[in-house]
Amino acid sequence: MNVLVTGGAGYIGSHTCVELLSSGYGVVVIDNLCNANPVSLERVETLTGKKVTFYEGDVRDEGLLRKIFAENDISCVIHFAGLKAVGESVEKPWEYYDNNLNTTLVLTKVMKEVGMKNIIFSSSATVYSADNEMPLKEESRTGGCTNPYGWTKYMTEQILSGISHADPDWSVVLLRYFNPIGAHKSGLMGEDPRGIPNNLMPYITQVAIGRREKLSIYGNDYPTHDGTGVRDYIHVVDLAKGHVAAVKYATGNKGTEVFNLGTGIGYSVLDMVNTFMEVNQVELPYQIVGRRAGDIAVCYADPAKSKEVLGWTAQETLADMCRDSWNWQSKNPQGYGE
C-alpha cells in the first residue's frame, strides 16, 4: 500500500516517512522545499534502506498531482504541506490563506477525480478556543483562533469535514498536534528551521551549540507553577507513529474522526530548559522578556481517544526529547546544511 505524503521533506513529514516505510508502506512525497531540505529524504532512505519516490513541486499544481496519482497506486494521503509559523501568519495572512487552504482544495479535487478518498490532515491544537478548560478533549470548543495560521487549520478541518459529510465514501482523519519536539534517535534527522527558529526546542539547541547568544523566555508572570507558559511537548517519533496508526484507521473506516496527539502532560518553558541542561550537561544562558501577543498560559491534551480508538500512546519522556534534540543538533551543527 502506497501513501502520498505532502510536505514529506519537512520535520514531521520526514519522520513520518521513516515510520511508514518501517511499517511496510510505500512512500510517495510531494514537497516544494520552501521550508524543507531534500537531504532529509536521503536520510530517510539511509535509515530504512528503502526508496522514497519524490516529486518536487507545489500541491496547488493540479497537473503534477494528476501525474503523481497516475504514476503511483496511492491508497491514502497524509497532508502536511503548508506554511506553519504563527507570527509570520499575522504579518502575511494572504500567503497563509492562499497556501494552506488552496493546497487542500486542489488536493481533494484531484483525489475526488481519481476516486481515492482517504486523507489524514495535519491539524493543530491552535484550532481550540483559548477559553477552554484543560486538558483539551476532541469535543472542546474550536474556533476563536488568535492568528491566521490557526484559522487555516480550523478552516481546513471544516472543508474536509464538509466533503466527508456530503460524500460518505470519504475517510477523513484530523490529527490535532500539540508541540512536537525531539529528533530521530540516530541523530541523522531532526528539526532544521530556516532563519530564526519560531519554536522553543530548535532555539534552545542553537543557543547550546553556539549559533545564538541566549534564549529569550517570553513571560514569567503566567498563572503556572513557575510563571512560564506550559505546553504539551510530544516526541516527533511518537507523533510519526500516530500517523501510521491513523493510516490503518483511515483505510478501514469512513466518515470524519478527530484525534489529539499529545502526551497529556504539561511542562513549562523552565521545565524544558532545566531538563535540557541536566540531561545534556550543557549550559543554556537565557533572559526573561515580556509576553508574546496571543500566547496562552497553559495548553495540554487529553489523549484518551487516540489510545482507545487508534491504539496509540506517546512513549518518550521530556528527558528523551531533550536528549534526542541535542544529539541531532550536536551531530549536525548547521542542520541539513552540513
Protein language model regions, located:
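Short, basic/glycine-rich phosphate-binding loops at helix/coil junctions
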Residues: 182-184, 221-222
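C-terminal substrate-binding subdomain of Rossmann-fold SDR/epimerase-dehydratase oxidoreductases
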Residues: 200-338
